[in-house]
Design a protein with these regions (language model features):
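Short cytosolic juxtamembrane segments of multi-pass membrane proteins
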Residues: 305-306
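Mg2+-dependent prenyl diphosphate-binding active-site environment of isoprenoid biosynthetic enzymes
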Residues: 14, 23-284, 292-302
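N-terminal amphipathic/basic leader segments beginning at the initiator methionine
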Residues: 1-23
Length: 306
C-alpha cells in the first residue's frame, strides 16, 4: 500500500501542477471572487479525478498534454465547486475541509456561492482550450464524431441534472423522508458520487481514441467504483476510527439518515463492496498496463480506512 501511496502522491503533484497552469489571475474588480476560487482549488486533496483521467488516457494510448490537461483542470474545478456549495450554511454548513476553514467561513456565504459559480463556469472555459488546441483526433464512433466535443458533452452531462446535481437533489429530498428504498439510494450514489468518476475516466478514454464499446465499459467500471466507494463510506461511519477519519463516527445514525448499511446491514454491505470492486477491476484488467497503477489505485480508493 505504501507503493501505491507514493505513486499517487507523485501523480497528484503532477495534477496540481496542471491545475496551477490554469488558475485565473487575481486582478480587476472581480479580484475577490477569483481569490475565493483559487483558495478553494488550492485546498489540497489527492486529485483523484484528474489522476484517473490522465491514467486512463495514458493507458489507452493518449500522448498529447494539450488535449488532456485542460480537461484535467476542468474536472477538478467542477469537483471543487461542488464541495464549496456543499459546505454552505444552506447545505451541510461545514466550517472545515481538508484541515482548513471552508470558503464561506473565510469569504462569506455570498462570495463562496459566487466562487462555486465561477469555478463551474471557468471549468468549461478551460476545457474549451482542449477543444481549440488544434490537435487532430480520429473521429469518435458514438453520437458525436468530434472527440473533444464528446468529452465536453460527458463533462457537462455528468456534472449536471442527469449526474452530480441530480444526485445531490435526490439526496436532499431523501433527508426529509422516513423511508428510502434501495433503488433511490443507489440512484443517489450513482449520481452524487459516481458520476464525476465516470466523467473522469470516460473523458480519458474518449480523448485517447477508444471506441464507443470501450468507453461504455469504462463508464460501467467507474460507476461500480463510485457506488462501492460510497458504500465503504457508509461502512466507515459505523465501524471506522474517528482519529483516522478525522470526523465523528455514527453521524448518519445521529442524523437519522438512511444509508446502505441501515438498509442492507453491515455484512451484506461489505460483501457488496467486495463484489462491485471485483467487477470493476475485472473490467479494467482488459486495458493493458492497468495492473501497474490503475487497479491498485481503485483497490485503495474502495478499501480505504478513512
Amino acid at each position: 500500500m505504501s507503493d501505491i501511496m507514493s505513486t499517487l502522491t507523485a501523480r497528484a503533484e503532477e495534477a496540481e501542477g496542471v491545475l496551477k497552469k490554469y488558475l485565473p489571475a487575481e486582478t480587476g474588480y472581480q479580484k475577490k471572487v477569483i481569490e475565493a476560487m483559487n483558495y478553494s482549488l488550492m485546498a489540497g486533496g489527492k486529485r483523484i479525478r484528474p489522476v484517473l483521467m490522465r491514467e486512463v488516457y495514458r493507458l489507452l494510448g493518449g500522448k498529447d498534454a494539450a488535449v488532456i490537461e485542460p480537461f484535467m483542470a476542468a474536472i477538478e474545478m467542477i469537483h471543487t465547486y461542488s464541495l464549496v456549495h456543499d459546505d454552505l450554511p444552506a447545505m451541510d454548513n461545514d466550517e472545515y475541509r481538508r484541515g482548513r476553514k471552508t470558503t464561506h467561513i473565510v469569504y462569506g456565504a455570498g462570495m463562496a456561492t459566487l466562487a462555486g459559480d465561477g469555478l463551474l463556469n471557468y471549468a468549461y472555459e478551460v476545457a474549451m482550450k482542449g477543444f481549440l488546441s488544434g490537435v487532430k483526433l480520429p473521429p469518435y464512433d458514438g453520437e458525436i464524431a468530434d472527440r473533444t466535443a464528446m468529452a465536453l458533452t460527458i463533462l457537462a452531462e455528468k456534472a449536471g441534472i442527469y449526474g452530480m446535481v441530480g444526485g445531490q437533489c435526490a439526496d436532499i429530498e431523501a433527508e426529509g423522508k422516513k423511508e428510502v428504498d434501495s433503488a433511490e439510494l443507489i440512484f443517489i450514489h450513482e449520481n452524487k458520487t459516481a458520476a464525476m468518476l465516470e466523467s473522469s475516466m470516460m473523458i480519458g478514454a474518449v480523448l485517447a481514441g477508444a471506441d464507443k464499446a470501450q468507453v461504455l465499459e469504462v463508464e460501467q467500471a467507474a460507476r461500480k467504483i463510485g457506488v462501492a466507494f460510497q458504500i465503504q463510506d457508509d461502512i466507515l461511519d459505523v465501524i471506522g476510527d474517528e482519529k483516522e477519519l478525522g470526523k465523528p463516527i455514527l453521524s448518519d445514525e445521529k442524523n437519522e439518515k438512511t444509508t446502505y448499511v441501515t438498509l442492507h446491514g453491515l455484512e451484506e454491505s461489505k460483501k457488496d463492496v467486495e463484489r462491485l470492486s471485483k467487477e470493476a477491476e475485472d473490467m479494467l484488467s482488459k486495458i493493458d498496463g492497468s495492473r501497474e497503477f490503475l487497479i491498485p489505485l481503485v483497490d485503495w480508493m474502495i478499501s480505504r480506512n478513512k
